[in-house]
Amino acid sequence: MKKLLSVILIACASLSAYAQSPYIHKVYAYHPAPGQFIGEHYPDVYAGDTYESILARVDSALSGASGNAMITLGAWGGSVTFGFDHDVQNRPGEHDLIVYGNVYFTGEMADGHAVSSSEPGIIWVSEDVNGNGLPDDPWYEIAGSASAEAMREYQVTYYYSTGDVEWIDNLGNTGSIKRNSWHQQDTYFPYWESMDSLVFSGTLLPPNMYDKGNGVIRSVAYDYGYADNQPNDSLAAQIDLDWAVDAEGQPVHLDAIRFVKVQTGVQVDWGISGEMSTEICGAADLHIATSLTDRPLKPKAEKRIRNGQLVICIGSKTYDILGKRL
């Protein structure tokens, strides 16, 4: 009987280990800042939608291994919070995590750096210290290559409008998320959250703009440490949990993490291309993902020419260079 019980316990343990998914298990929160896609696409928004219905759509888009969905976080401060069905281990000398974006390189160079579609998002990670399965424990920022120039304890207030969305930060600077002819929804403001104002707090990265002139602005990717910053198939897109820091920017050691929050890290107006906004296509535990041969990683964004026009392909979906679905 004892032998039979041991066999059953071993079998159950094996099934439990096999059941672990390398990909996002659940999306817990979605709080986008204003932006040109907000209230229109990524996720799609319909009349009568509520925070709960939109959160469910984001969860459906990002959870699992489909690899063809994308969400936008809007301008600086917008965020999404998700978790895995297991603890992502911090293995010494290895990259542990990847958050998938839709970055591509244009083939141009600026000051020795490759020009790209980088829209960097800051990655925050958290343990499940209290064991309740919720992202309510302390967060730690992943300090990427621009961390030394970043501004912590930054805050922006956005004000509802059906025109340009005005904002003011805690330093007294002002600006706006400008409407453009490409996106004609009633408002660029996430109205299901508020019809008045929204306040976002976090870390502000230095601008990574490259001005081509004639109103066309591109970005230069940071070296490492951010979401939607380097192509998905690049080592520079992968994250080492040893890069985690506390609120004062001091390194912390985490044995493992369960939850991830990604937040648009820059406040940049791309001219005719609209605001810079982090886009997310999923995430994976690299220690599990690299051991699975029957489940491919999320596809990278690829440049292609169709009918003489540059387009961006992510999986089975195609977008123009301004992010409009074709």
Predicted regions and their residues:
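Tryptophan-centered short beta-strand motifs
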Residues: 133-142
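Hydrophobic h-region of N-terminal signal peptides that target proteins for export
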Residues: 8-18
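Beta-strand signatures of extracellular beta-sandwich domains
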Residues: 122-124, 317
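Residue-level detector of functionally pivotal "anchor" positions at catalytic/ligand-binding pockets or at interdomain
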Residues: 286-316, 325-326
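Short loop/turn segments immediately following beta-strands, especially the blade-tip
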Residues: 126-132
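Positively charged n-region of N-terminal signal peptides that target proteins for export
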Residues: 1-4
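A domain-level signal for the mature, folded cores of soluble proteins
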Residues: 20-121, 143-289
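Short, ordered coil/turn segments that flank beta-strands lining enzyme active or ligand-binding pockets
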Residues: 129, 306, 321
